[in-house]
Amino acid sequence: MIGIDIVSIARVEKCVKRFEMKFLERFLSPSEIVLCKDKTSSIAGFFALKEACSKALQVGIGKELSFLDIRISKSPKNAPLITLSKEKMDYFNIQSLSASISHDAGFAIAVVMVSSSNL
């Protein structure tokens, strides 16, 4: 399955200014916050990536999957890497996850591809 999401960078910037760390901690782990380096476009990209992952799994963010179950890191070449907690990898019987993020014209867009025998 494939999931896609697009986020307004300006909207994320308003939320960061208004709610500061409380906003970030709602959907990013401490290591993901460090990866974003206070860069609003990166924060928006990570948000879009987590939403795209939930859509690819056909559950959305909620009871079956939380933002913090989805983990983002970077490859040595700075490409996004995505995984889920062990519990969720098993729950969804995920074999592999692939991700891409792009930024342009004030938006961040993300695509996630999930290989699973359940979907």
UniProtKB/Swiss-Prot annotation:
A Pfam family that the UniProt record links to this protein: ACPS
Cofactor(s) needed for function: Mg(2+)
Major localisation: cytoplasm
Enzyme Commission no: 2.7.8.7
Ranges annotated as spanning the membrane: none
Binding-site residues, Mg(2+): D5, E51
Name of the top EC class for this enzyme: transferase
Example of a GO cellular component annotation carried by this entry: cytoplasm
Domain of life: Bacteria
Stored NCBIfam families: acpS, pantethn_trn
Name by which UniProt lists this protein: Holo-[acyl-carrier-protein] synthase
